């Protein structure tokens, strides 16, 4: 982290203050984290999630993610200042000072831990806190600026919300919880490397050793291809041998996975084509959201009743 010579700018209204602090949390990232939490919770609760517990866990997860992203903004303010697309963020533009942002981040973390401890359980709260610590110390401080494997290892932080959701429901972590964690972990490289292919020049400008910058596009798309295949296979392990999800989820996972593989295959053969990389990046977001939605739908008692009714009718016909 390098200090930047940014003059302090004052907000013209209280609304602008709120907007600046809201932007610090990188709110567009958070919904994707929450959907993995939801998918995990519904499977753990066998489709019958306590609405209050769901609300509390989502709120606690949001606060934890917001805290981690705020600290990330503090740490990365130097490189954000050097990139045109990020120069106008609250930290590099001088709208929010380091001390104020740090107090904000700590307050969010404390609120998250307290909320989850009181209304869920200590395991869920501890996992959320560990996610903040891992993201800040391992990814932001250590890996991001020093290793091409930054988002691979750092992807563990983004996968922790799935564990938080499971722990909030059961108070334990089963093999299914760890598999959902692994699915998100394995999905992260194709997702972020596709983005890195799109903005490779920005990363090169500020010296971030993303894989496309160091190894080139051809090597990157090969890694994307391998991780995509492994991710799709991993999603099916929830059906067999773990039996945590059923036929509805299996159909959704196979359909989504087929498209994911096809788009990754196209990028493998067009490593320099940014529109193809963008297409994969955008689809990877939809893929994870719809996959988790499939977990939710499959876990619902109504879904089970409908499947059983169809099976019984087929037996009668045969």
From Swiss-Prot:
Tell me which species this is from: Trichormus variabilis (strain ATCC 29413 / PCC 7937)
- Identify the NCBIfam families for this entry: cyoE_ctaB, PRK04375.1-2
User: Per its record, how is this protein called by name?
Assistant: Protoheme IX farnesyltransferase
Give the free-text miscellaneous remark of the entry: Carbon 2 of the heme B porphyrin ring is defined according to the Fischer nomenclature.
Q: Which GO terms describe its cellular component?
A: plasma membrane
Pathway membership of this protein? Porphyrin-containing compound metabolism; heme O biosynthesis; heme O from protoheme: step 1/1
Major subcellular location class: membrane
Described function: Converts heme B (protoheme IX) to heme O by substitution of the vinyl group on carbon 2 of heme B porphyrin ring with a hydroxyethyl farnesyl side group.
Instruction: Report keywords, A-Z.
Output: Cell inner membrane, Cell membrane, Heme biosynthesis, Membrane, Transferase, Transmembrane, Transmembrane helix
* Biological process annotations from GO: heme O biosynthetic process
**Where does it reside?**
Cell inner membrane
Segments spanning the bilayer are 29-49, 51-71, 102-122, 123-143, 151-171, 179-199, 219-239, 241-261, 280-300
Q: Entry's InterPro entries? A: Protohaem_IX_farnesylTrfase (IPR006369), UbiA_prenyltransferase (IPR000537), UbiA_prenylTrfase_CS (IPR030470), UbiA_sf (IPR044878)
Tell me its EC number(s), please: 2.5.1.141
Q: How does it sit in the membrane?
A: Multi-pass membrane protein
Q: Which gene is transcribed and translated to give this protein? A: ctaB
Record family assignment: Belongs to the UbiA prenyltransferase family. Protoheme IX farnesyltransferase subfamily.
Output one GO MF annotation. protoheme IX farnesyltransferase activity
- Uppermost EC category: transferase
The catalysed reaction is: heme b + (2E,6E)-farnesyl diphosphate + H2O = Fe(II)-heme o + diphosphate
